[in-house]
């Protein structure tokens, strides 16, 4: 018995679109390229109409009774569909969770750097996980870490809103911030 191959080297089976001769339904509801109904006609007559106009007969909906076909230029239609899909992919931004780590005994300049990082992440539309980690007996000062995280949330309140308040998780205290959808309106002091 020959050994079984480790990988399937065959190319994947591509689903071919139902156009022209690949349409197997005997009766079709046909719509022309302008959107005008041509009525329910048999398949051969619909193919003849499409070839006279030098266009393709494309199956639009096979769930309908009878199935709906459209007379159109399939190459142009396929190009436009790919273009729309590409635009949609370009516009959709995958939200990531970026992390900003620090200790509760952080220096002023280091804190400002973390605020700058968090601001950059929030402006690019990502969520921010603020983590304060403890070493050894520092865990006894979790109240100082919570104060630090709340101060950070307060400093970033123009760009963000608290998604999850500070809470302890093992040897860390974490807080999640998400980008603010609407700009914060500051109240006038006076």
Curated annotation (Swiss-Prot):
Annotated GO MF terms: ribosome binding; translation initiation factor activity
Gene Ontology BP term (one): ribosome disassembly
InterPro entries for the chain: T_IF-3_C_sf, T_IF-3_N_sf, Translation_initiation_fac3_CS, Translation_initiation_fac_3, Translation_initiation_fac_3_C, Translation_initiation_fac_3_N
UniProt entry tagged with the keyword Cytoplasm: yes
PROSITE patterns: IF3
Subcellular location, record wording: Cytoplasm
Entry annotated with the keyword Protein biosynthesis: yes
Coiled coil: none
GO cellular component labels: cytosol; membrane
Source species, domain of life: Bacteria
Keyword line: Cytoplasm, Initiation factor, Protein biosynthesis
Pfam families named in the record: IF3_C (PF00707), IF3_N (PF05198)
NCBIfam families, sorted: infC
Database matches in HAMAP family: IF_3
Description of how the protein assembles with itself and partners: Monomer.
Family: Belongs to the IF-3 family.
Function: IF-3 binds to the 30S ribosomal subunit and shifts the equilibrium between 70S ribosomes and their 50S and 30S subunits in favor of the free subunits, thus enhancing the availability of 30S subunits on which protein synthesis initiation begins.
Name used for this protein in its record: Translation initiation factor IF-3
Gene name for this UniProt entry: infC
